[in-house]
Amino acid sequence: SQANIFPSLVFFWFLIFSVPTGMLMSRIGQKKTVLLSLIVTFASLLLPVFGDSYMLMLISFSLLGIGNALMQTSLNPLLSNIVRGDRLASSLTFGQFVKAIASFLAPYIAMWGATQTIPTFDLGWRILFPIYMIVAVIAILLLNVTQIKEEKEEGKPSTFGQCIALLGKPFILLSFIGIMCHVGIDVGTNTTAPKILMERLGMGLDDAAFATSLYFIFRTAGCFTGSFILRKMNAKSFFAISSFMM
């Protein structure tokens, strides 16, 4: 449906920009790349304040996807300069916990805005965007004043062809396929579960929409508990258990 185009745009641009972002990061540094991602995200959240036309929302979600690609590609390497060893995996998982909270709250903030439960300044459901835009501004300011010593890469930056050639290694290829499957399940559950429940089980819209909320409740809980479990358990064993549960 038309509604499914918007979340798909976010991941489409991640597919396009992930490799070029890695090359950009090698040239300007990890911190500057993350700052750039936050600035692009800020722009994507600013546009809906001026309207909700179809074209404006397409541009907004495209910029959101580009910002997401820049951030996802550069944030983990940047964090590795601060957190090392066994704590890195748990710190990355805790970051997913924060992300899951944002995903869980988004539909409720939009609903509260649409029903005028919270002040919306005549934006209605679009009040969601300036709220998250403020969070982006805070992140930009805090990261900009934070001193991070980045490890310098030795040798020449990798070319686009060299990055693609990594898929020739079985481990890299299997990891790539695994990530695609995981993201597909995540996005598919989020966007299509309510529709399937309405069509197959005859549920009402409110009851079917709760399926998405239930998914994010357990995802949030899983990320939170996982961040602590990974401090005690081997990351490889934890990954195997998580894959089996999926």
Model-based region annotation:
Residues 39-52, 244-246:
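C-terminal ends and interior cores of transmembrane alpha-helices
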Residues 29, 50-55, 202, 234:
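Helix-breaking motifs and short loop linkers at transmembrane-helix boundaries and internal kinks
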Residues 168-213, 217-223:
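Extracytoplasmic gate region of multi-pass secondary transporters
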Residues 60-97:
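Cytoplasmic helix-loop-helix junction between adjacent transmembrane helices
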Residues 91-147:
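Helix-loop-helix hairpin linking two adjacent transmembrane segments in secondary transporters
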Residues 5-23, 213-226:
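Central cavity-lining transmembrane alpha-helices of secondary-active solute carriers
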Residues 150-175:
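Juxtamembrane intracellular "pre-TM" segments in multi-pass secondary transporters
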